[in-house]
Design a protein with these regions (language model features):
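Carboxylate-rich, polar loop motifs that coordinate divalent cations or form catalytic acidic clusters
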Residues: 19-357
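Bacterial N-terminal signal peptides that target proteins for export
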Residues: 1-7
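Intrinsically disordered, low-complexity segments
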Residues: 2, 15, 245-246
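Bacterial N-terminal signal peptides
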Residues: 7-15
């Protein structure tokens, strides 16, 4: 049974639970299940999900603009497009800084900043490393980091000074950023992972164990579609139509309470770094798909992974997977976020799925 309620540019579709259809290697307690879906359009992609905890709202970055959703009521609060002040409607990243400004990373439009109805967009002329912006992260000292296709920016939010780092990184194409308890900053790039502790840099790639070996016999690809400025479709296919593989290509990072670093790789599954070595998890261990786009973490440490074949929930011991049969809008899940009430929000083509108990 499906019930649809339409709002401007954002349709709400209530979906029946289908948890029993999920593939699982777990037993025991009842798992979270798909509760409802929000559709944004047949050919629209949801690429970014960010929870603003102070307001209990969810920011949804899509290929046609940004929506602000009230988490409690699931109602649309705001919809922003180019006419509203957004630099470009194709949004790959959403961040919230210490001053409550919302930052939107766009495809070829720079970074737009918003608060209280006022907009400002930053371009390379202002110090931004590139027009293509893929990630934001905040340090405890208040600085914001911005990942682009031409390095990273460290932004002093008091002076709005932009400092750019390129050569220090293992690769200049930066997709994911995470900050650990020591305020060290980790960067996921198309060539591996780099870490900056404030003074020195370190880097790791597949040579050091990042990403599993090519178990699926996928086509080798140093460039999967995101690493070329002529295509922005998150293509998983090589020229001959085969799934591609690049274990050093890291699209997202997550730091867990034990300070392990989890890296989402392109074809090499998900990798966990304990400070000494990398341990890889693939479909052989229970991961839904070996191309991993996104990672989110619950307050209890449970991890969620968005892949090319659905979502995986991992509690440190066992896996539980979700796909279209379980109620997801699509199997390719590009973005994940955890709401204050523990619900999981998943972004894909066509819209967003909410998972909860």
């Amino acid at each position: 049974m499906h019930t649809s309620i339409f709002a401007p540019l954002f349709a709400f579709c209530l979906t029946c639970s289908a948890a029993d259809a999920a593939e699982t290697k777990s037993t025991g307690d009842t798992f979270p299940h798909v509760i409802e879906t929000f559709e944004v359009g047949e050919n629209v992609n949801v690429r970014a999900l960010t929870v603003e905890t102070g307001k209990n709202t969810l920011w949804v970055g899509t290929s046609v603009g940004v929506h602000e959703i009230d988490i409690a009521t699931r109602k649309v609060i705001n919809t922003f497009t180019r006419d509203s002040g957004l630099a470009n409607e194709y949004v790959f990243a959403v961040g919230v800084d210490k001053n409550g400004y919302k930052w939107f990373g766009t495809n070829a439009g720079g970074a737009s900043r918003y608060r209280d109805g006022k907009w400002k967009t930053y371009f390379p002329m202002h110090g931004l490393a590139d027009y293509w912006v893929y990630s934001f992260a905040n340090q405890r000292n208040g600085d914001m980091w911005i990942g682009t296709w031409a390095g990273v920016n460290r932004v002093d939010l008091r002076s709005m000074k932009f400092t750019t780092y390129v050569k220090e990184l293992i690769n200049e194409w930066v997709y994911g950023i995470a900050v650990d308890k020591q305020d060290r900053v980790w960067f996921g790039t198309e060539g591996g992972v780099s870490m900056f502790d404030g003074k020195t840099w370190r880097s790791w790639s597949h040579k050091e164990g990042l990403g599993a070996t090519n178990q699926g016999k996928l086509a080798a690809s140093p460039n999967t579609g995101l690493g070329t400025r002529s295509r922005h479709d998150l293509s998983m296919l090589s020229g001959d139509g085969k799934l591609t593989y690049n274990p050093s290509y890291v699209f997202a990072l997550q730091i867990t309470p034990d300070q392990s670093v989890w890296a989402a790789t392109w074809g090499g599954g998900v990798s966990r770094f304990d400070g000494t070595r990398w341990q890889n998890y693939t479909t052989r261990e229970g991961l839904a798909g070996d191309i991993v786009y996104s990672i989110a973490q619950e307050s209890n440490g449970v991890l969620w992974f968005g892949t090319n074949n659905g979502i995986s929930r991992y509690d440190g011991k066992s896996w539980h997977n979700y796909d279209k049969k379980a109620g997801l809008l699509e199997d390719n899940v590009y973005a994940l976020a955890v709401a204050p009430n523990g619900d999981i929000w998943a972004g894909s083509r066509r819209g967003v799925t909410r998972i909860g108990r």
